[in-house]
Amino acid sequence: MFPAMLNVGLGLRRGLLPELLAMEAGAVDFLECAPENWIAVGGAYGKGLAQLAERFAVTCHGLSLSLGGSAPLDRHFLEQTRQFLDRYQVRLYSEHLSYCSDDGHLYDLMPIPFTDEAVRHVAARIRQAQEQLERRIAVENISYYAAPYQAMSELDFIQAVLEEADCDLLLDVNNVYVNACNHGYDAQQFLAGLPQARVAGMHVAGHYDEAPDLKVDTHGAAVKEDVWALYASACARFGVQPTVLERDFNYPPLAELLAETARMRAVQCAAGGQADE
């Protein structure tokens, strides 16, 4: 029986699979995977996913739907994703508010111009994806370094997309911090401007300090203190939401990752959340 509340999660990465398979039930509430990396996987990896899904709830965070792209949405991939989400009874599916294809795959998450036209374009694609997937999507605020054309602020753009598409938000707290440092806005004010009812989950991760005014979202290090503080503010404003610790490389021993998820749970409890028994 999975916990009724999915409070604390860890990103499912193939490099962590042996340790995750040996992890005690209850160490985290759920695991988050990218469906693209697992849909067609068999062998030891496929067996490992099936074993983990019997012990932990699964959520999904997509990588390649390219909601902001110009090419038509890949309906075959959407159908594969829908079947994957149904098979593993996925409660939360999210995708990046970005594009990653332009006459071919770009292998990166590119920011969308902050314009009214882009709002209408991406919102229509989100609605189409939600219809085919037969569930709501939460879109994630991304980190970006070269700002796209901006007829409105990032905050106004996100607000408009959420309203026009009638979708949810996966709030990446580290990305808010990174963008605030890099583009000179106040992270707390950014959180205060987001619609509370739309936040369906959160991410926390580590970043690299290139300079005081240049942070790089790497997912390759421990979560920094400023991000923990911002996460506490996010929990205070939006309540306890399913939160994933993302770590994509430079994997430490699993015990170190679980120490971070334990801290995540402590922050949630301080904000009024309750740990599942």
Swiss-Prot record:
Q: Which InterPro entries match?
A: MbnB/TglH/ChrH, Xyl_isomerase-like_sf
Lineage: superkingdom? Bacteria
Gene3D superfamilies documented for this protein: Divalent-metal-dependent TIM barrel enzymes (3.20.20.150)
Please name the NCBIfam families in this protein's record.
PRK05409.1 (NF003818)
Q: Name one Pfam family in it.
A: MbnB_TglH_ChrH
- The name of this protein is UPF0276 protein PP_2398
**Classification via HAMAP family:** UPF0276 (MF_00697)
Q: Report the family membership.
A: Belongs to the UPF0276 family.
